[in-house]
Structures are given as C-alpha cells and as structure tokens.
Amino acid sequence: MSSQFFLKTSQDIELFQSYPTFEQSNTNSKDFPVISSVLSPCGRFLALSTKENVKVFTGPCLDNVLLTMKLSDVYDLHFSPAGNYLSTWERASIQDPNHKNVKVWYLNKPFKKDCVSEDIVPAYEYQAKSQSGWFLQFSKLDNYGLRLFKHDLKIVKLSSANADNFDFQSPFAVLSDDETSQHFTTYLISPAEHPTICTFTPEKGGKPAQLIIWALSEGKITKKIASKTFFKADSCQLKWNPLGNAILCLAITDFDSSNKSYYGENTLYLLSFQGVNGTLGGNSVRVSLTTGPVHDFTWSPTSRQFGVIAGYMPATISFFDLRGNVVHSLPQQAKNTMLFSPSGHYILIAGFGNLQGSVEILDRLDKFKCVSKFDATNTSVCKWSPGGEFIMTATTSPRLRVDNGVKIWHVSGSLVFVKEFKELLKVDWRSPCNYKTLENKDEAFFENHIINNWEPLPDSTTSSLDPKISNKSELQIHSSVQEYISQHPSREASSNGNGSKAKAGGAYKPPHARRTGGGRIVPGVPPGAAKKTIPGLVPGMSANKDANTKNRRRRANKKSSETSPDSTPAPSAPASTNAPTNNKETSPEEKKIRSLLKKLRAIETLKERQAVGDKLEDTQVLKIQTEEKVLKDLEKLGWKDE
C-alpha cells in the first residue's frame, strides 16, 4: 500500500493514493462547509467539524463513520500523539459563564455503528475561553495528561483500563513554582518512553529567564536534570528530539536593541541529558550562530544532529551535534526552511515566503551532496511523504488566494503529480499506523481501530510505503503533469528537476549586453546589413578625421583626371562647412523597441534583487511576470536576442 494524502476545500475532503497511481480513494462531501479538519498522528482517524456536528472517520480509506457528536460551533480539533483522545473546542457561550467548551473524547474502544454522542460521554471537559493553547498535553503513548492551573502543572496517569482518569484534584504528580516570583509560561513533555518535562520562565524584574528539564516522578516534582539561565528572553519555542533526551529552545525578545530586526532578537539554547531521568547527568549550552534572526531549526530523525538556518539574507545553514559543535556548514544562500526526511537520509532546504521558492535536496549519507534542485514558487505547505521518497508542496488559502493547488515531487527533483484548485484550504500526508490494530469480530461494532499492543511494528512498514527509484528514467510521471505544463508553458523549466530555465539561443546575457558587438537590428533589414551610424556624421564619412581628409583628396584627384587627362591636377578644395547632416527621424518601430528594452532592463534588475532575497512589492512581482510578453513584442518588431 502506498502513502496517502488528503486535500480539504471549502466543500469537501478528498483522499488520494500516492505514487504511482494517484487515484482518488474517497470524497467526503458535506451539506455544510467544513469548519475544521485534522488527521490523527497515528493515521487511524480523520475528524472534521461542521456547523452542527463533529464526525470521526476510520478505515483504510477513512470512509467509515466511527462516531458522530452533536456539537455546534466547534472551531478547533486536536488529537493526542497516539490518537487515543480527540479534543474539541467550541465557541464559549455568552449566556452560560460556566460553559465547559472543551471536551476530550476517548476513541481507542469499540463503537456501535452509527454511534452518536448521546450514547457516550466525554472523558473530560473544562473551560478554555482562549483558542491559544487550549488543549491538554499528552505523552507519546497517551499514558500521561498535563494541564496548567495558574502556577501548578498537574499530571494525571492514564491507561486503557482507566482512560477517563482526568482527576486533576488528586493528580499523579505536581510541578509547582509558587516559591518564586517568576512563573513558567511554556512547558513541553518529551516524546520518550519515560518522559521528562521542560519548562520556560521569561525574565522579569531584572531576573534572568530560566530553562529547566524536570524528571517526572510521582508526587511533587523537585528533581532538575538540566537548567540554563539567560537574559533577552520574553518568549520561546521548544522542540524535543525524537528520543526525548535533548531539547532546543529558541529564546525571542519582543524588540531588537540594535534596531536591525523588526521581529526582535533570537538566541538558541541546547539542553541534553543521558540515562533515564538524567541519571547520567545533563548539559546545557548556547548554540553559536551567525548574527541575525533564526529562520528555522529542526532535529534529525536520528536525534543525534540538528540543523539551523540563521543570519541576515543570504542566510548561513549549519548542522550541529548533541554537544552544540558544528558538524557541517553550507555556503550562504537565500533559504529559510529545513526539513529532514523521515529516515534522515535526505535534507530539504528551501526559500519560501517572500523568497523565490528554490528547493535543494541534500544527501546526508553522502557528505551533504546536493542531489537535485527544483523551483516551487508561492509554496505555503511543504512536507515529506511518510516513506521519505516524495515531497508535497502546496499553495493554500487564505495565505495565497491565487494558483491554489498541490504538487508531488520525487526526491530526484522531478514533478510527478499536480492538481489545481480554485480554493485549497489544507493538505497533509496520512501517517502510517506503527502499531497493530484489532480485527472486527462483531458486525455491529467497529473494532479495527483499537490498539492493545503498543510495541511498534518493524521500521520496514514505513519504508515500504514509497518505492525506491534509483534510475530517473524509470520514474512514472502522472498525466496531470503534462496537462499542467501545456496550460502553463512558462513553468516547464521549474518541473524538470534542475531548477534552471534553459533558453534556446546560447548562453544568457543581461539586456544591457545583448547587443554588444553587433549592429542595430532594423525591421525588414537582414541581420548584419545595418551599419552603426554616428549622430551628426556625414553619411559615408569615417569617424577618423585623417582618413576623411585623404579620401577627399583622392576623390578630387580622380574626378579631375577623368574630366581632363592632360591637365594638371588642381589643388583639392577645402572641406565644405555646410556638409549635409543626417536629419532622418527615428521610426515608430525603433521608439517602441527602445521602450521595450527599457522595460526589460528594469525586469532584470528586479529579478537580481529577488535572487538575493530582497522582498518585492506585489506590483514588482507582477512586472517580472510580464517578461515573456515583452520578449514576444520585441520579436514581433524584428528585435533579436544575440
């Protein structure tokens, strides 16, 4: 079975098989627009909300309705890491101040077919008026649940036998910061089998910010595994590595004291430890980066390295080990996105957003060698396939309301599938389920979504999703690509895997150098027949003054010898001061050519600015897109690119 991906529009949700067929597996059309939709990280469920209800789908093609909940105005959905819990956020009621607008539903159990919410009750419900950070945090296997109560972080222990044990009044563990005037604002549980918790406390009243990793144990949590104190930190972003033994913290200030950045200053810190709950010690370092903003930072799936894109454009791209030492650096380039493939074999670096959309694929196992390049302009979503052989790029609304669609690329840089939409809202790959599920034994119940054994399946299950194609000629290109190229011929070069536009007619020359060494191209005159003229120079005269004098004498002598062969040659007459001048006016065609060449030079200047990462106005981007039309107009007027 190949990978699957889903596409959400304002009217329906479509599920597609990936390479090589790209067949549409299922379409869930609704009478009402879909407000929110999300795939579970485990790949077992698809949840979507409308104005009147919330539905959960399951099955190989996500076409079986597992559960229908009669909830109105659900604007956000969230799955736990293992997919056992679905959280729904409703708009808070104005009439009822005690309205519990967040409900947590347990899904890893049998459900009657055509089950509705009247038959079940949520495992937990509470009030969260803000839509920011409203959901509970869960550990990797959903065996711990976390919720922050003012200054206390309370943890409950969960299991399949006690799935609704959300008793935060008698929690399994408590992490409190009542003893200090500073209180942590951000926390994140690690994805390890024996999880730990990282907390961030911003600086306040002259006291430095704190970053601490805590060991999770029953009762009051007091053991610190690793910690780091620093200034210049109003907020932060936390990212654990997949093994859960190291975390990156991007500290952010609201203002840049040097006034070089509108978005504040960035500093990156690394905390790591060894052994269960840090029994072998911890370590904390500040990662040394180039001056400037941090555009992206991400962990390798191996958990042994991480990559950072930082600095003013063109940015510096570096890779580090768990000690914070530089392993490898790439030349500076206009890039702001980095993504490791699921196996860690390939690394994608790209320049999206206000950059030109160039993408490079590096081979981590071959000394970071560049495997392929391609252009994916206007990309708002970029993700690796679960098998690690294909890349999805998409343009979605409301980020961009034009050229909406999805493209699938092979790691070799070849475009293999395209689908365009008038309005595309969301795209995502469906993750494979890494655990064994039960089989249906009772026709009246759904049971094939239940996981009882939490031992992961072999890694070969994920890697077999995408075929390994070493020879590019064996790659099967979907018919949609040819249709796309025929409709957009100017974009053909961006889908050929080399990321460069090849022009017929020799090497590229900038507009100001295209006519160097050649005469003027005059409409209707063969190339090379037109000669250069100097304004104010007598036709037929040379620009060399001495040569003109000799030619005058030679013509006078020849004329006198022809009229009177026996007569003595008369002295040559002085040059006439009233020589005729070239008063011929410039033709309308030449004026038009000059105007078009001026536009071409301006377009070339804008393209050079765009190539180095400068942000262009919308009108300037539109002007670049008129280059092809300008060249066609010049060709019609007889101008040729030499």
UniProtKB/Swiss-Prot annotation:
Family, similarity comment: Belongs to the WD repeat EIF2A family.
An annotated Gene Ontology molecular function: translation initiation factor activity
Described purpose of this protein according to its UniProt entry: Functions in the early steps of protein synthesis of a small number of specific mRNAs. Acts by directing the binding of methionyl-tRNAi to 40S ribosomal subunits. In contrast to the eIF-2 complex, it binds methionyl-tRNAi to 40S subunits in a codon-dependent manner, whereas the eIF-2 complex binds methionyl-tRNAi to 40S subunits in a GTP-dependent manner. Specifically associates with both 40S subunits and 80S ribosomes.
InterPro entries on file: TIF2A (IPR011387), TIF_beta_prop-like (IPR013979), WD40/YVTN_repeat-like_dom_sf (IPR015943)
Swiss-Prot/TrEMBL WD repeat ranges: 69-115, 186-224, 289-331, 374-419
GO biological process, one term: negative regulation of translation
Record flagged with keyword Protein biosynthesis: yes
This protein's UniProt keywords: Initiation factor, Phosphoprotein, Protein biosynthesis, Repeat, Translation regulation, Ubl conjugation, WD repeat
Compositionally biased intervals (Low complexity): 493-507, 563-583
Mod. after translation: Ubiquitinated, probably leading to its degradation. May explain why it has a short half-life of 17 minutes.
Modified-residue entries (Phosphoserine), positions: 564, 567, 572
Taxonomic source organism: Saccharomyces cerevisiae (strain ATCC 204508 / S288c)
Protein's recorded name: Eukaryotic translation initiation factor 2A
Effect of residue 165 to K: In strain: SK1
GO cellular component: cytosolic ribosome; cytosolic small ribosomal subunit
Stretches for region Disordered: 485-593
